[in-house]
Amino acid sequence: MNIWIFNHHALTPDMSGGTRHYDFAKELVKRGHSVTIVASSFHYSKYKEIKEYHNNEYLQETVNGVNFIWIKTPPYFGNGISRVKNMLSYTYKVLNIIPKLHLKDPDIIIGSSVHLFAVYAAHKLSKEYNTPFVMEVRDIWPQTLIDMGMSKWHPFIILLGWLEKYLYNKADKIISNLPYAFDHIGKFVSKDKFIWISNGVDLDNINYIEKIETDKFTISYTGAIGVANNLTLLVDAAEKLKEKKDIFFRIVGDGAEKLKLKELVKLKKLKNISIEDPVAKNEVSNILQSSDILYFNLKDSPVFNFGISSNKLFDYMAAGRVIIFSTKAKNNPIKDADAGYTIEPDNLKQLEQTILDIYSLQQSDRNKIGKKIRKYVEKTYSMCVLSDKLEKVLEDEVRKYNA
């Protein structure tokens, strides 16, 4: 198959962030398929351009057999009108640039949210090229925006609500990485139109190495540093445990709350925690493997009523370290693995005690927990296993469309 994927925020492994579509594409290329990913190169969390266009509006490159087309879009910061302009720019340019490139016609087109305008562009091109159209829902807009506080009567929300229903109706198949997305999507389509395909982890990038005890006991967090991640709690835990000289905390990533965290650490005069810049996806494993505990936290929010499918969590699990899962999502992969620790979000006392409980274990006992988590992710959330599922879905849709 020749597969086109439209994901505004797709990344390659030399960038920091999730690489769902690159990872799927790499697996599909191994199986003889051709994959082209069309993305913007303005980074969604760093808020900066990561490619040099000079006077061009797009760039083409091939990364490990995966074709990328990068679309130049205007800069933005935060979630204001400039971000909407960035979304619309991507959509407009995709519809104008892609047909002019005279690429080999696709067999199937996937349009992936977060934002629905990218999915709309994929739908329009599927009509132009007479191919099946697969809609992928990675964030349920506009419901997520309403859950975050926007009025359901805001004109932008009303527009998104109309577009959401239109795209559900036009899609030949709907995929979501969220395990309970059908609780919402099922209001509009029948069950046979929907399939859950989780995020996962490329196990080639994160080898399991048994942890050896050292003179530092390290608790690490990697990824976005935003309001939803509530990392102030981890700084507070570092303050509570500062007398334990061999316990050290690391926060590695970027986001709107990073400066605030740095100032908080400085104000508290803490020497047992570092706030570090993000690293490329293919360098994350070094941080994970050097850690004793990996911390996953999300504030309690209705946004997670449809479950979570976190690339970061699956990376943690692949590293085979003890995980503290502090989230009230509808699903819990750590509980499913029957290993690791689950605590309430925003509960400092419970976090402090859980760290001390794990700290008091023998290294061999911590390694047993880590191995169990690793085996579970190999069986359930490896990109190889998930790609089997995606490949079958796409082949079935192409077959039905051409019958």
Question: What is each model feature region?
Answer:
Residues 1-64, 179, 241-243, 402-403:
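N-terminal subdomain of nucleotide-sugar transferases
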Residues 4, 212-238, 250:
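Conserved donor-binding/catalytic core segment of Leloir-type glycosyltransferases
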Residues 95, 117-120, 124-128, 154-174:
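Membrane-proximal helix-turn-helix segments that form the acceptor-binding/catalytic region
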Residues 180, 197-200:
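Carbohydrate-associated surface elements
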Residues 229, 276, 280-287, 294-317, ...:
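Nucleotide-sugar-dependent
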Residues 252, 259-286:
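Nucleotide-activated donor-binding/catalytic signature segment of Leloir-type glycosyltransferases, i.e.
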Residues 337, 341-349, 357-363:
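Conserved acidic donor-binding segment of nucleotide-sugar-dependent glycosyltransferases
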Residues 346, 363-396:
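A charged, aromatic-enriched C-terminal amphipathic alpha-helix characteristic of glycosyltransferases
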